[in-house]
């Protein structure tokens, strides 16, 4: 074997090793990106859990207010004040009912968002590990 043959063989092996190293570096970069995305989705899921807790607390407060609104705690002598009180109480009940419905819708939306964030976190984590 002469020097040129050896040189050609070494250069060929170096190119193969360099190509393989570039492929590995690219794979590491891609998987690192997946891990970053998985971490971001996990953090989002965690934050959405707190938001859900806040909404559930608010929903309980609204439910308590609705229950309290149904109780007649004020008695006013005379027809006009009673009518005004009843109208305002009914308006308050209606607004509390609407608020409760909005809270339920928001709660459902947050729950879906939390589930999707959890699924995405798992998806990207699995991509990074496979």
Swiss-Prot record:
Coiled coil regions, renumbered to chain: none
GO CC terms of this entry: extracellular region
Keywords associated with the record: Secreted, Virulence
Main location class: secreted
Compartments where found: Secreted
Domain of life the protein comes from: Bacteria
Keyword Oxidoreductase: no
Membrane-crossing residue ranges in chain numbering: none
Record note on quaternary structure: Forms both homodimers and heterodimers with EsxA. Homodimerization is calcium-dependent.
Free-text function comment from the UniProt entry: Implements its pathogenic function during infection.
Family from the record: Belongs to the EsxC family.
Protein name (record): Type VII secretion system extracellular protein C
Organism taxonomic ancestry: Bacteria, Bacillati, Bacillota, Bacilli, Bacillales
Name of the coding gene: esxC
């Amino acid at each position: 074997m002469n020097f040129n043959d050896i040189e050609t063989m070494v250069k060929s092996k170096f190119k193969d090793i360099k190509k393989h190293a570039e492929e590995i570096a690219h794979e590491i970069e891609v998987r690192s990106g997946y891990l970053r995305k998985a971490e971001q989705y996990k953090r989002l899921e965690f934050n959405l859990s707190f938001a859900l807790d806040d909404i559930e607390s608010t929903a309980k407060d609204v439910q308590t207010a609705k229950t309290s609104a149904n109780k007649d705690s004020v008695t006013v002598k005379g027809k006009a004040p009673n009518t005004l009180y009843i109208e305002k109480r009914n308006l308050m009940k209606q607004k509390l009912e609407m608020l409760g419905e909005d809270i339920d819708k928001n709660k459902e939306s947050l729950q879906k968002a939390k589930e999707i964030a959890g699924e995405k976190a798992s998806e990207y984590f699995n991509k990074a590990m496979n």
